[in-house]
């Protein structure tokens, strides 16, 4: 006897964490999920982009979705407690919490939340992200927000860490001009396309980071239908801003590369505000990427 198991559809061949209506962000706010290969600079990019939106007069909330909870420290100038840690302190009775227990104000008024995550090898990071959004809604903290940025762990595209895609309008992918970063980006494109079948999320574009050139990125973009939205070269001031625990907007603009980076972040934020045209990109097969990238 053969038993056929049917799985809830959420893109072809995928089983994903489903978010109920109570944890979805209301229409009106611009919601961006930032993905990319681990260590590529997503937190740096997210924090500086949040700062740029705030400079343009927007009310911004950044949600770090990594158990390392290091997404927002350049905005807050410290490591803030995570939502999961705070909930554990009150035995998960969220009604006992006040907003300032888990949400912290950073540079130029940016609101910062670190969702945290379960111990390594246990639990589901997507569930934690969903509970974070639910908590924010319970305390009416999303009602006066113009922009929400999810800074997502590594290039994990399982059901759990794909959860932010269920809230987002756009996904931005951070990459470098190298094989490994672009290979990871290709997998992320596939995950976003799967989510886009049932959710509003669409590809917003590529952020080239720590890259002097764009030749390999542009090769990939041409084949898949992606587009580079911003380009940040390997500017030492960005590295030093992390060590100083501050955003690029708090660095001396007379230093080499600082003003250029600030302007590029402001330009990227303005592009997103002006309603980016969603991209219809198609991922390549692994062998196709292998054959595509490299020098002739």
Curated annotation (Swiss-Prot):
Residues binding [4Fe-4S] cluster: 124, 158
Reactions catalysed: chlorophyllide a + oxidized 2[4Fe-4S]-[ferredoxin] + 2 ADP + 2 phosphate = protochlorophyllide a + reduced 2[4Fe-4S]-[ferredoxin] + 2 ATP + 2 H2O
Binding site for ATP: 39-44, 68, 209-210
Keyword Disulfide bond in record: no
Gene Ontology molecular-function annotations: 4 iron, 4 sulfur cluster binding; ATP binding; metal ion binding; oxidoreductase activity, acting on iron-sulfur proteins as donors; oxidoreductase activity, acting on the CH-CH group of donors, iron-sulfur protein as acceptor
Keyword Cell membrane attached: no
InterPro entries referenced in this protein's UniProt entry, alphabetically: NifH/chlL_CS (IPR030655), NifH/frxC (IPR000392), P-loop_NTPase (IPR027417), Protochlorophyllide_ATP-bd (IPR005971)
Domain of life the protein comes from: Bacteria
Pathway where it operates: Porphyrin-containing compound metabolism; chlorophyll biosynthesis (light-independent)
EC number: 1.3.7.7
Binding site for Mg(2+): 43
One biological process term in Gene Ontology: photosynthesis, dark reaction
SUPFAM superfamilies to which the protein is assigned, alphabetical: P-loop containing nucleoside triphosphate hydrolases
Keywords: 4Fe-4S, ATP-binding, Chlorophyll biosynthesis, Iron, Iron-sulfur, Magnesium, Metal-binding, Nucleotide-binding, Oxidoreductase, Photosynthesis
Pfam families: Fer4_NifH (PF00142)
Broad class of enzyme this protein falls into: oxidoreductase
Cofactor: [4Fe-4S] cluster
Matches recorded under Gene3D superfamilies: P-loop containing nucleotide triphosphate hydrolases (3.40.50.300)
Annotated cofactor note: Binds 1 [4Fe-4S] cluster per dimer.
Family according to the record: Belongs to the NifH/BchL/ChlL family.
Subunit structure: Homodimer. Protochlorophyllide reductase is composed of three subunits; ChlL, ChlN and ChlB.
Function: Component of the dark-operative protochlorophyllide reductase (DPOR) that uses Mg-ATP and reduced ferredoxin to reduce ring D of protochlorophyllide (Pchlide) to form chlorophyllide a (Chlide). This reaction is light-independent. The L component serves as a unique electron donor to the NB-component of the complex, and binds Mg-ATP.
Protein name: Light-independent protochlorophyllide reductase iron-sulfur ATP-binding protein
Lineage of source species: Bacteria, Bacillati, Cyanobacteriota, Cyanophyceae, Synechococcales
